[in-house]
């Protein structure tokens, strides 16, 4: 998993404050905007936070990408397994961590699998992934279209997403997906997004008590 910044609105916090003062044009160029942004967050005037945007590159797996793509307030561009050879991203499929299913909460897992069992099962997974990747490559060599060959690949296959959204969307996504109830691997992505967000939007992050 890796998350990196691609682009962000120039002077984003200043720009949002400028737009927030649309009804007070004589004060729009006021450089003191921290208090205004804090006020807007405190009183949930969220529309102003739709005026600035950020795009991140997220390198993850197909399984996690399916969860991320459900956040429809964002716009996405994803690596196409139909157009491109998946080996362009990585020739190996990463072995996932293994956790026990929580029988009381089906959306939760518990990290208490014995090490010996974990190693045994991860080796089985490694063999399975290698066989799947070998078959995928064989299909390509035989002239089978990528759009057909991709169906033998597991959900752990690497993918790349460009995720673009407003500050408001990022606040909602990070708040939701960095909290309990989110799959650990997705939580790690959300926290990586949060780290970049706090660097790019320090005033907003402080008002949200993220720093």
Which role fits each region the language model picked out?
Residues 1-211:
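Family-specific signature for flavin-dependent thymidylate synthase
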């Amino acid at each position: 998993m890796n998350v990196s910044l691609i682009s962000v609105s120039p002077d984003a916090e200043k720009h949002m404050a400028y737009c927030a003062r649309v009804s007070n044009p004589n004060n729009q160029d006021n450089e003191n905007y921290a208090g205004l942004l804090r006020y807007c967050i405190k009183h949930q005037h969220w529309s102003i936070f739709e005026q600035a945007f950020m795009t991140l590159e997220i390198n993850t797996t197909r399984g996690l990408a399916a969860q991320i793509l459900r956040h429809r307030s964002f716009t996405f561009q994803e690596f196409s397994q139909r157009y491109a050879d998946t080996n362009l991203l990585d020739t190996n499929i990463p072995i996932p961590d293994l956790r026990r299913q929580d029988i009381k909460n089906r959306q939760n897992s518990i990290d208490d699998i014995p090490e010996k069992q974990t190693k045994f099962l991860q080796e089985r997974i490694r063999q399975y992934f290698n066989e799947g990747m070998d078959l995928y490559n064989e299909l390509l060599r035989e002239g089978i279209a990528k759009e057909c060959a991709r169906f033998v690949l597991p959900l752990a296959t690497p993918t790349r997403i460009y995720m673009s959204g407003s500050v408001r969307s990022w606040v909602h996504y990070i708040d939701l997906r960095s909290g309990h109830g989110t799959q650990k691997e997705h939580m790690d992505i959300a926290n990586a997004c949060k780290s970049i967000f706090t660097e790019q939007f320090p005033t907003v992050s402080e008002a949200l008590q993220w720093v």
